[in-house]
Structures are given as C-alpha cells and as structure tokens.
C-alpha cells in the first residue's frame, strides 16, 4: 500500500508541519487563556469584569482530562482503506467524511478529511480541535484525535452508526421507515441538552453558530450528538451583549439579526434550534426550492400558520400519517414558534427549551392505542390542567390559566432565586418591550399566555367574535405571541420545581447531563 501512497514516508517537512500545528494549538490556547476561561463552574469566575480568565479543560465528567491523539496520515489512510469510495459516509462544504477502523485498537471511527480548497481553513481546524478537546457532554460528539501531516488536515471522531438527522428526515428511500413522533421529540430534547451545555455550563458560553439537521449525528437508539464545531465562537462576557463577527453558517438556519448585522448572541443558536425543531415536526427542509412558491423557506411558510392553531395539524409531517398526540403537536409547535421569534430578546433561554422538550419526550405515544389512552398519562407541566373542570381545546386537552397555576403552587416567594421571582422577572422582561411603545404595540400589563391564545383561537368564528376580529391587528398578534413566550418560561420553571419537590433534591438529572 505504501507504494501507492508516496506521502506515507516521513519527512522533515511533515514533522515541521506537525510541530507547527501543535505550536498553533498551544498559541491559540494561550491567546484565549488571557481573555477567556472555559469551565463548568461559573460561580467561581464571577468576581468582576476585570478578572483574568484562563482557558482550562472542564473538571467534571470521566473524559474531562482526555487529550486528543495525534495520528499520522499513514495511519488514517490505512484505517479508511486509502479513502476508498465505499468508505465514504458523506461530503459537505468542509470536506469528506470516511468510515474507518484504527489498526492499533480496532475502534470504528469517522475520519473527516478537510478540503484544502473548501470552506474550513486552518483556523476552523484549530478551533474544532481546541473546542472538542475541552468540552465533553453526552450530547456532543467525541473527538478522538487529529492529523496534521504536511498540508493534510484530518479530524478523527467517534463513529455514529445512524448518520445525521438530515438522513432520517429528508429524501427517504422507499424502504426506510420515517422517524416516529416519540423519537423525534427525544432527538430534539437531546440536541437541546447539548446546546444547553455550551450555553450554560461552559464559561464563557460557547455559541455553536452552525446548528442544522446535518450536524446532529445519531448513535444507537437515535441518541443525538452535536458535531462540527469549526464555526463555534466564545460568547460575550462581562457587560457585552453580543460578539461581532462575519456572518457564517447555513442559509435558512441563521437568525435574522445575525444575518443582517453580524451580531451574534446565544439567542442566535436558539433560533437555529427552532428551525431544526420545525424540521422535525414538519418533515420539511429549511430551504427547499423544489416546493411551490411561498414554501421555499420553512420559517416563512410556518409563520402565518403559527397564528391559527386550527391549521396546526396541517403542519405535521405527512409521513407520520396522523400518528402523533394532538396536544403534543400543539405544544411542540408552540415551542418552535417561541424559538423563532424575530426579536432575539423574546426567544426563550435554551434551558427553558430543554425543560419543555424533556417533558414532551417523556410522554409516550402508542399509535395503536385509542386516542384517550395517549392524552393524560402521567403528570403534565404546571400550566396543563389535570382536573376535570378544564377548558376543552377540541382534542380533550387544555391549559391552565396563570392564576390557577399560582394557586396550585402556593403563595409567591420573594427570594430572588425562587421560581415565583424568576417567573415575574421573565414576564416583566417580555412585557417591558410591549408596554414601552415598542414596535409590537402597547400592552395593558396583563400576563397573557399560551392558554389565553388557545382560548381565543377556539372561540374564533363564533358570533361574539365576529365583531372583534377586525380589531385583531398584526401588532396585537405579535404582542400575544411575546406574552406566550413569558408563559412558556413560567411553565418550564414551575414544572422543574414540581419535579424537584416530588423526587427530592438532585433527582431531576435529565436536564443536567
């Protein structure tokens, strides 16, 4: 084999190149050391904006101290059978990915060979090696090592046998079963947990910047992991609200404020997650020029449908063939709509999204069971009624009003870390923009939520509502949606507290992986 691979022979040039990359990694590590610190313990780093921060590996988890291996090009060529076409797993703007087996350990791996003329250059290569060497989570792909022989740049990852989420959503062959509803919710919850780790556990937070269905890889049992961190950026620290950078990413997934201004925030990732979640619900691509005019862009197609819950069933993936819980569909679309708010400040935090999706993923759905047996199994989130005196939503489900939620949870607490305090703070945060004469219109200060919106939708078309329909301006509808964001945050926080109260301290570990 060495005869057909002349670059196998070691040379001073290759050795110098490898040393150069190692120096660049060390230099990049050192340069970030002076300004940032990546850690899982945020409390120890909040001593003031002038504190110097160091880039260190997280101290938690069994893999926290594992360093990336260095491989020779010979080793990786042998692992992939000289990069034969039958070993090719996929190809993108950054290069090709091959399946291989390491001769030394027998481990099955995925080898990404960067295209020297592609979109990912040496800087992105270094960023990915650095990020994945430091950040470890069950929902982030594991980096095994890298190769920097000569001008070759290769990354070695753990092998994900089920491919990418994109492979299971779009352009399915006739013999391939589509994902069922429960699996879709589980994948969404896992991907959100990976994003939550980057946003909330790393310090400073890491902005992924390239969240899309092709970058969510699936392992056994459809366990999702985020991959491809070449575009990741360290988030704002101190008093900064954003980081300014050139616009990168994939069309159809980029948040509008980032695409227009280059100002990147954690909420930019939340928007991208909303697009992926909408793909999971609808089965549509983020951008699909093969569809009819007006349906090319997934978000643009969905926005008017979000305003009328009677059209929600039309948004479900036809390949599901109606095998999904109606209430679960409504709640999933509500979460997607909140993530896709045009104003970044009104999008939920990824931690609240994790709470909502963890609940949705926990609701098992049997497509063969009678509809009544799938509706109210287990305890719902706090704003979902569990009593019989519920307002019907047409599918046997209903939502609590904010007052009923508060009465069931007891008197409001005043401590700043209590759920009630944070709930009021989140409501004020969303209402502040509407009451101050913002572009979404004025507001009365009433805490409207998802229950109010669904109640209005259920009454639409009645004689009493005919006269009011002319007053439902787009500005008011935007205000309603903003208030729905606040109520969703209330739901997430209250449900989390109920779980803690029911199972004891530390029992709600599903959001702390």
From Swiss-Prot:
Keywords: ATP-binding, Cell membrane, Kinase, Lipoprotein, Membrane, Nucleotide-binding, Palmitate, Phosphoprotein, Plant defense, Serine/threonine-protein kinase, Transferase. Pfam families: Pkinase (PF00069). It is a lipid-anchor. This is Serine/threonine-protein kinase PBL27. Its EC number is 2.7.11.1. The modification Phosphothreonine is found at residues 245, 250. Changing residue 250 to A: Impaired CERK1-mediated phosphorylation.
């Amino acid at each position: 084999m060495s005869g057909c691979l002349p670059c196998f022979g070691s040379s001073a040039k290759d050795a110098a190149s490898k040393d150069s990359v190692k120096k660049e990694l060390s230099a990049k590590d050192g340069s970030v050391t002076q300004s940032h610190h990546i850690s899982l313990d945020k409390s120890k780093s909040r001593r003031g904006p002038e504190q110097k921060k160091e880039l260190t590996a997280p101290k938690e988890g069994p893999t926290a101290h594992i360093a990336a291996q260095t491989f020779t090009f010979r080793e990786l060529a042998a692992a992939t059978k000289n990069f034969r076409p039958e070993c090719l797993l996929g190809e993108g703007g950054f290069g090709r990915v091959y399946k291989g087996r390491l001769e030394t350990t027998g481990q099955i791996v995925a080898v990404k060979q960067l295209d020297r003329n592609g979109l990912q250059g040496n800087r992105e290569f270094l960023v990915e090696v650095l990020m994945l060497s430091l950040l470890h989570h069950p929902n982030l792909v594991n980096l095994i090592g890298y190769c920097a022989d000569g001008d070759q740049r290769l990354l070695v990852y753990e092998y994900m046998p089920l491919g990418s989420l994109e492979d299971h959503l779009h352009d399915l062959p006739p013999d391939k079963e589509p994902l069922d509803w429960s699996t879709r919710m589980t994948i969404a919850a896992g991907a959100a947990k990976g994003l939550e780790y980057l946003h909330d556990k790393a310090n400073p937070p890491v902005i992924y910047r390239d969240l899309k269905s092709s970058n969510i890889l699936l392992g056994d049992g459809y366990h999702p992991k985020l991959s491809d961190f070449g575009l990741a950026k360290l988030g704002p620290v101190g008093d900064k609200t954003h980081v300014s950078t050139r616009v990168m990413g994939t069309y159809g997934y980029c948040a509008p404020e980032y695409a227009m201004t280059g100002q990147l925030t954690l909420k930019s990732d939340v928007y991208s997650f909303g697009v992926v979640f909408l793909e999971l619900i609808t089965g549509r691509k983020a951008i699909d020029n093969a569809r009819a005019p007006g349906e090319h862009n997934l978000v643009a197609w969905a926005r008017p449908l979000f305003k009328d819950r009677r059209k929600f069933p039309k948004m479900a993936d036809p390949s599901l063939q109606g095998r999904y819980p109606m209430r679960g569909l409504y709640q999933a679309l509500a979460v997607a709509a909140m993530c896709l708010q045009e104003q970044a400040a009104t999008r939920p935090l990824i931690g609240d999204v994790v709470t909502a999706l963890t609940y949705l993923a926990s609701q098992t759905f049997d497509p063969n069971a009678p509809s009544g047996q799938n509706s109210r199994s287990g305890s719902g989130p706090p704003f979902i009624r569990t009593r019989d005196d519920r307002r019907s939503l047409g599918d046997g489900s209903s939502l609590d009003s904010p007052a009923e939620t508060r009465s069931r949870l007891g008197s409001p607490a005043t401590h700043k870390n209590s759920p009630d305090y944070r709930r009021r703070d989140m409501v004020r945060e969303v209402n502040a923009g509407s009451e101050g004469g913002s572009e979404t219109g004025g507001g009365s200060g009433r805490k409207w939520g998802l229950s109010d919106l669904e109640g209005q939708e259920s009454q639409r078309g009645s004689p009493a509502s005919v006269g009011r329909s002319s007053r439902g301006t787009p500005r008011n509808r935007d205000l309603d949606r903003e208030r729905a964001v606040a109520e969703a945050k209330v739901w997430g926080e209250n449900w989390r507290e109920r779980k803690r109260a029911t199972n004891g301290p530390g029992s709600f570990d599903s959001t702390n992986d």
